[in-house]
């Protein structure tokens, strides 16, 4: 059976989209078949899409064609009678092309008395599609009720657009389900008895009527709307936690773009999505129009699949049983109201449950009107602490209160894990499944998760009620011990230590030492380096992706190409440069080892020019590379040295900046200056106790030697696998600080795709390209180049995904390069665990080796 469907654009932007398609389609036809006057004549309907064959989940088939009437709602309402005639003309055109049923989208049914008047003049049956649209809105509301865990009697629903056909049918379904309703009707219609007459009398006690939207805002947080006017509800007036289901077009929320509020949710109701079992004509590369299909169009398709040549969904009264019937038939054929969407973007359970706190004041009492009462706040905190949240609840909280983009990114990569416990090299999720951790907090966990000797040292100090934050009213004993140990262990002539809480703070302290001791504002740094994300550290981080949003940064910072001694000599001879910041291995830059002899030459240049040599060992230090300090591989003796990450065994934040005593004296050795740099939490006894224990265990367990031996074995094993696959270009690093460089080339792929389409599609698109303006061509070429780069990054992330999903191994990319996977396991890793990773890596390489070039 063949159907036709008449759609229309619902916004000016969509109208111009249809205009663009029409222009391109006619131009393509002209280039392919030649010019004719008829081709460029005014058309009643604009061709949009032909479905040569639709196959449903049951195996039923149909075919159809969709055309647009190129008018928005306001234009149609301005000439309702004339548009009604054009709709009938359009139906006749479709019937002439073989359509046996025609669906009327949006206003194309409204202008014909919801299809009734149109049906009287139509040569074939018609449907407004409003029954399936209603069903989709109903199912969306039922899903939201379930996710919010509320009962119908607990939360009233506002129905906006009563007694329109969709709102009337939806009201009857919701009342039958137990909801109370606030019905918003058009102003001027105040006959209460007439308005209530559309509903069974048994429901009247659960219904209120109003023509003023202001009455709804304080009463309701759940809304469903389907008016013919649109723009009825002001999103700024909605209560926090409100969920607004815009069931039909035009939008009834007064905003064509998503409102800038994160405490409400606007849902595109009335839409359905086809499952994978449904085939909508020819499909290639899983590219087909299947998601968020308007219910009116989907109803037309479903009726055609059923071979039902009958008028359907006409007039004001849509029988609830017919609504449920068409919904059940649609689901049988593979069309469902899920997933939900907001302004075209898919949303999931988490988007709804983020608002749950606005509905459960018994649990979230601290956010209720009684939040000012101490007892209420205490009850809230106690309730949160007592919870053992499910994984989804934790994702919801993080999404709501910390970083929604991070949650969405990890979900996209199938790496949205939530772990409950950790020990050694293993992390355990709430199902008790173990994951091998090859990231180790980006170098924080050299001793593994919760190293018992360090945990014991922490417990013992707390059990003894040892003092912690006393460093500004007395001298902290444990911190003094730690400073001595660090100065004795570190290379160079270290004599002073400043303690902080992180690597980037340690870098900030080093920069201040350099400025204060030399009197020079400038610091040289290396391209592709990474030293942290505070403003000072960013100023000497050699990667624009981290810096561009925070400019202007510090002046007088000088970037030098990595490995270029001539450029470095020029920079160090500048009058305003007093220090050079380097990493022994560029970790976040992609695990790059300097060229042989480079670091010794760098040190010599610093000595010749009198420039301070500052070495960032935040990630490379404390055994990671097979030496206690990575700079020892090259015999480097820094003037300033930075440590953090594994200094406390990953248990307590700590950073340390070591320097020569004479530098400290120049910077801070006067009555006015000895306290000009400080940190509230830096230098506390508790962190120092833990750090002393961590340092002892690194040495006692010979993790430095273990890292050297296991790292050499690991690198060799990975390199042998990499040699078999051209998309793994290099395995590099030292000790247990390794990086796997991927190079799955997509250069030219997007360009080839564009040329292929230009060649195969009707018309002369190559000539069209020639006459695009130069700036347009330049932007398109740049977009194609970046897209090809993104495809390579996507391929690399598939390794992260597959290692996690298929092998329960955690890895991640480096901060500066999305085509390098970091391998930084705890230094306690066993040979068997390394072999497990090597085997998994080999398997993933083989599985992703469809293309070898």
Swiss-Prot record:
Positions bearing N6-(pyridoxal phosphate)lysine: 645
Subunit structure: Homodimer.
MF annotations from Gene Ontology: identical protein binding; pyridoxal binding; pyridoxal phosphate binding; transaminase activity
Protein species of origin: Serratia sp. (strain FS14)
Keywords in alphabetical order: Aminotransferase, Antibiotic biosynthesis, Pyridoxal phosphate, Transferase
Pathway this chain belongs to: Antibiotic biosynthesis; prodigiosin biosynthesis
Stored CDD domains: OAT_like (cd00610)
InterPro entries tied to this protein: Aminotrans_3, Aminotrans_3_PPA_site, Class-III_PLP-dep_AT, NAD(P)-bd_dom_sf, PyrdxlP-dep_Trfase, PyrdxlP-dep_Trfase_major, PyrdxlP-dep_Trfase_small
Record protein name field: Aminotransferase PigE
Top EC category: transferase
Role played: Involved in the biosynthesis of 2-methyl-3-n-amyl-pyrrole (MAP), one of the terminal products involved in the biosynthesis of the red antibiotic prodigiosin (Pig). Catalyzes the transamination to the aldehyde group of 3-acetyloctanal, resulting in an aminoketone, which spontaneously cyclizes to yield the dihydro form of MAP (H2MAP).
A GO BP entry: antibiotic biosynthetic process
Residues binding pyridoxal 5'-phosphate: 503-504, 680
Family: Belongs to the class-III pyridoxal-phosphate-dependent aminotransferase family.
E.C. code: 2.6.1.-
Gene: pigE
């Amino acid at each position: 059976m063949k159907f036709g469907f008449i759609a229309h654009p619902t916004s000016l932007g969509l109208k111009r989209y249809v205009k663009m398609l029409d222009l391109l389609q006619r131009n393509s036809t002209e280039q392919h078949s030649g010019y004719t006057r008829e081709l460029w004549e005014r058309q009643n309907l604009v061709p949009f899409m032909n479905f040569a064959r639709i196959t449903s989940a049951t195996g039923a088939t149909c075919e159809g064609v969709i055309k647009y009437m190129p008018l928005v709602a306001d234009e149609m309402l301005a000439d309702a009678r004339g548009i009604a005639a054009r709709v009938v003309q359009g139906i006749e055109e479709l019937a002439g092309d073989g359509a046996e049923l025609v669906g009327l989208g949006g206003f194309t049914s409204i202008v014909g008395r919801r299809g009734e008047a149109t049906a009287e003049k139509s040569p074939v049956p018609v449907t407004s599609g409003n029954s399936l649209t209603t069903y989709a809105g109903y199912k969306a509301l039922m899903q939201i009720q379930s996710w919010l865990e509320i009962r119908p009697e607990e939360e009233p629903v506002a129905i906006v657009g009563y007694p329109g056909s969709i709102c009337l049918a939806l009201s009857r379904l919701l009342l039958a389900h137990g909801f109370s309703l606030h019905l918003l009707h058009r102003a001027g219609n105040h006959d209460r008895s007439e308005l209530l007459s559309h509903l069974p009398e048994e429901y009247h006690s659960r219904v209120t009527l109003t023509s003023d939207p202001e009455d709804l805002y304080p009463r309701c947080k759940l809304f469903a709307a389907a008016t013919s006017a649109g723009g009825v509800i002001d999103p700024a007036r909605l209560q926090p936690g409100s969920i607004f289901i815009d069931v039909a077009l035009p939008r009834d929320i007064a905003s064509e773009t998503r409102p800038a509020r994160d405490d409400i949710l606007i849902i595109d109701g009335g839409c359905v999505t086809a499952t994978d079992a449904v085939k909508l004509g020819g499909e290639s590369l899983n590219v087909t129009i299947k998601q968020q299909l308007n219910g009116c169009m989907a109803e037309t398709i479903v009726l055609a699949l059923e071979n039902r040549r009958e008028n359907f969904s006409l007039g004001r009264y849509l029988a609830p049983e017919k609504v449920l019937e068409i919904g059940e038939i649609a689901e049988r054929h593979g069309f469902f109201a899920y997933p939900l969407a907001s302004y075209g973007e898919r949303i999931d359970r988490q988007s709804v449950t983020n608002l749950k706190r606005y509905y459960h004041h018994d649990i979230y009492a601290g956010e209720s009107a009684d939040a000012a009462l101490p007892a209420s706040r205490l009850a809230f905190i106690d309730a949160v602490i007592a919870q053992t949240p499910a994984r989804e609840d934790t994702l919801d909280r993080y999404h709501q209160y910390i970083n929604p983009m991070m949650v969405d990114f990890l979900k996209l990569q199938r790496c949205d894990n939530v772990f409950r416990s950790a020990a050694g090299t293993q992390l355990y999720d709430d199902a008790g499944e173990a994951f091998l951790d090859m990231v180790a907090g980006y170098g924080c966990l050299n001793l593994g998760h919760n190293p018992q000797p360090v945990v014991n040292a922490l417990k013992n100090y707390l059990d003894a009620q040892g003092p912690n934050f006393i460093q500004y009213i007395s001298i902290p004993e444990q911190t003094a011990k730690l400073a001595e140990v660090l100065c004795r262990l570190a290379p160079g002539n270290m004599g002073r230590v400043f303690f902080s809480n992180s690597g980037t703070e340690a870098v900030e302290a080093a920069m201040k030492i350099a400025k204060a001791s030399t009197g020079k504002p400038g610091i040289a740094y290396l391209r592709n380096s990474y030293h942290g994300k505070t403003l000072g550290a960013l100023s000497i981080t050699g990667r624009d992706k981290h810096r561009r949003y925070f400019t202007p940064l510090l002046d007088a910072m000088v970037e030098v190409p990595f490995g270029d001694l001539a450029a470095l000599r020029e920079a160090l001879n500048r009058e305003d440069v007093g220090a050079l910041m380097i990493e022994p291995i560029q970790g976040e830059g992609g695990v790059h080892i300097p060229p042989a002899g480079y670091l010794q030459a760098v040190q010599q240049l610093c000595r010749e020019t009198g420039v301070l040599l500052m070495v960032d060992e935040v990630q490379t230090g404390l055994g990671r590379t097979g030496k206690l300090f990575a700079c020892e591989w090259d015999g480097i003796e820094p003037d300033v040295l930075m440590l953090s990450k594994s200094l406390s065994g990953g248990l307590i934040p700590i950073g340390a900046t070591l320097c020569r005593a004479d530098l400290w004296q120049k910077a801070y050795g006067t009555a006015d200056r000895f306290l000009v740099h400080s940190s509230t939490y830096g230098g506390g006894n508790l962190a120092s106790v833990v750090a002393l224990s961590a340092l002892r265990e690194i040495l006692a367990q010979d993790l430095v030697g273990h890292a050297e031996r296991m790292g050499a074995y690991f690198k060799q094993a990975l390199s042998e696998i990499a040699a078999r696959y051209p998309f793994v270009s290099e395995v590099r690093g030292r000790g247990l600080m390794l990086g796997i460089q991927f190079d799955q080339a997509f250069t030219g792929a997007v360009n080839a795709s564009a040329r292929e389409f230009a060649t195969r599609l009707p018309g002369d698109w190559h000539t069209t390209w020639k006459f695009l303006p130069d700036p347009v061509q330049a932007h398109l070429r740049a977009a194609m180049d970046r897209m090809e780069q993104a495809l390579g990054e996507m391929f690399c992330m598939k390794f992260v995904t597959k290692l996690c999903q298929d092998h329960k191994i955690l890895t991640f990319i480096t901060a500066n390069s999305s085509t390098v996977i970091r391998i930084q396991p705890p230094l306690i890793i066993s040979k068997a665990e390394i072999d497990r990773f090597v085997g998994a890596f080999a398997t993933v390489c083989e599985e992703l080796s469809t293309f070898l070039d």
